[in-house]
């Protein structure tokens, strides 16, 4: 499982012209793009949620848990793109939707159980993501 985390001053996700998830933190929040591979499980989702919640990448070396920063979670199978051969990425390392969707949901729910305010995109939908990356700060978490 991979989570590409961006520190943001605002972010939103739109599906079919409708905003389905948005954060407008004061002053910062996190955008988490989540990719799932074949051997991932609920335990990995829980551990990554805990790591993200405590990750000290906000101002003054604080974490989202320290300042109740909101998190926007968006599924992102392209985090498992393989570009070793040719010019067209392979998505073979990405788990199929039937495996990935429940694990993205588990990741999201684990964050909520930890106390996070979480907004989400729509799994499998074509999404337009708008964000203002603060810093910029972008970190890849992987288990």
UniProtKB/Swiss-Prot annotation:
Its main location: cytoplasm. A motif (Gly-cisPro motif, important for rejection of L-amino acids) lies at residues 135-136. One of its GO terms (cellular component) is cytoplasm. The keyword RNA-binding applies. The keyword DNA-binding does not apply. Homodimer. Belongs to the DTD family. This is D-aminoacyl-tRNA deacylase. It comes from Mycolicibacterium smegmatis (strain ATCC 700084 / mc(2)155).
